[in-house]
Design a protein with these regions (language model features):
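Hydrophobic alpha-helical transmembrane segments in multi-pass membrane proteins
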Residues: 32-55, 84-100, 138-162, 172-187, ...
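Generic N-terminal leader segments that precede the first folded domain
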Residues: 4-19, 24-27, 34-81, 85, ...
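Interfacial aromatic "cap" segments that immediately flank transmembrane helices
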Residues: 3-42, 122-149, 188-238
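Transmembrane alpha-helical insertion/packing segments
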Residues: 61-92, 104-192
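Intrinsically disordered, low-complexity regions enriched in small/polar residues
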Residues: 13, 24-25, 165, 182, ...
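Juxtamembrane transition segments at transmembrane-helix termini in multipass membrane proteins
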Residues: 2-6, 17, 54-79, 103-116, ...
Length: 316
């Protein structure tokens, strides 16, 4: 099966080639990324433990002190809660960074495929390919910042409108929903910008941003359809993978709700260890469930680039 990147393809062809490249080279991608996937899974598990165990437990303690016991919030609990929130925010930043570095190990191989149409299998299992990590991390940061700017500007405008017409809350909520939906749809070409930046070393992000975004916007329908169909498949698999995590998190939340109402926690002593192991395994498996999306975006980028090159030749 031929996996050339630069070929004009329909969305079906892009998705098919993306999954095909992934499954035909699964051992290569596993060997390239498994160490970073373990680090990602550890961060994922730690973050999930805070969100599903520690923060709900502290929240239940605070609510019990304030609403049930009427004793007021103790300084110790307040400090613990603020510390947990601070650690959670740091873990979210670490999560984004480790995710970018994990993606970078795979993009290193896709860059090799981009340049030579081949990919070599690493000789060692205990090896982290670092060539594309820095560029991928910069691409992540630049893309997130670029997307956050219009979000913040729009939020400021909408808050100003709410202040002017505070009595029209329902209308304001509809406007917010519509505005952010449109903004989200308009941000889809940023995936093309990201892939273009990563695959073209030597070019700065912001020198590519305007022209690449305009090019992606011209192919918005192709990008939307590709991401919708490919993403739905991956989301279903990811949802199935996350079921044990969701069930455990719900059990923790229900236990804390019972504690708030005066019931004992009722959770076995090993639940913390079981939860961490479950979250870790879920995080590790999620890396490889979501990885085909990288290949889909990669081939989508190649298809758009080929279409534009062929169009320019015809114009000449």
């Amino acid at each position: 099966m031929e996996y050339a990147l630069f070929k004009n393809r329909s969305y079906q062809g892009v998705i098919s080639k993306g999954f095909g490249l992934y499954f035909s080279h699964f051992r290569l991608f596993l060997k390239t990324s498994w160490l970073m996937a373990i680090i990602f899974a550890l961060v994922f598990a730690a973050l999930e433990m805070l969100l599903s165990v520690q923060l709900p437990s502290l929240s239940a303690t605070i609510m019990k002190q304030e609403l049930v016991l009427k004793t007021g919030l103790s300084p110790e609990v307040a400090q613990q809660y603020l510390l947990a929130v601070g650690i959670t925010l740091l873990l979210i930043l670490l999560y984004i960074m480790v995710e970018a570095l994990t993606v970078g190990t795979v993009l290193n191989k896709l860059k090799e495929h981009h340049d030579t149409n081949t990919m070599t299998v690493p000789k060692r299992w205990f090896y982290i390919s670092r060539q594309m990590m820095g560029r991928t991390l910069k691409g992540y940061v630049f893309t997130i910042v670029t997307m956050l700017i219009p979000v913040i500007v729009l939020a400021a405008i909408l808050v100003g409108l709410l202040y002017i017409a505070s009595d029209a809350l329902t209308t304001w909520m509809i406007i917010v929903t519509v505005c952010y939906t449109v903004l989200g749809l308009l941000s889809l070409p940023m995936l093309f910008v990201f892939m273009k930046y990563v695959m073209n070393k030597g070019k700065s992000y912001f020198s590519l941003l305007g022209s690449s975004y305009a090019r992606g916007l011209r192919h918005w329908g192709h990008i939307f359809t590709t991401l919708l169909i490919g993403g739905l498949t991956i989301c279903v698999l990811a949802g199935i993978c996350c079921l044990p995590t969701i069930i455990l998190a719900q059990a923790h939340w229900s236990s804390q709700e019972g504690f708030l109402n005066g019931d004992p926690l009722g959770m076995p002593g090993y639940i913390t260890t079981l939860s961490f192991i479950t979250y870790f395994l879920t995080g590790f498996i999620l890396v490889y469930i979501c990885m085909p999306m990288l290949m889909i975006v990669y081939y989508m980028y190649g298809s758009i680039e080929t279409f534009e090159q062929e169009k320019n030749k015809l114009d000449i």
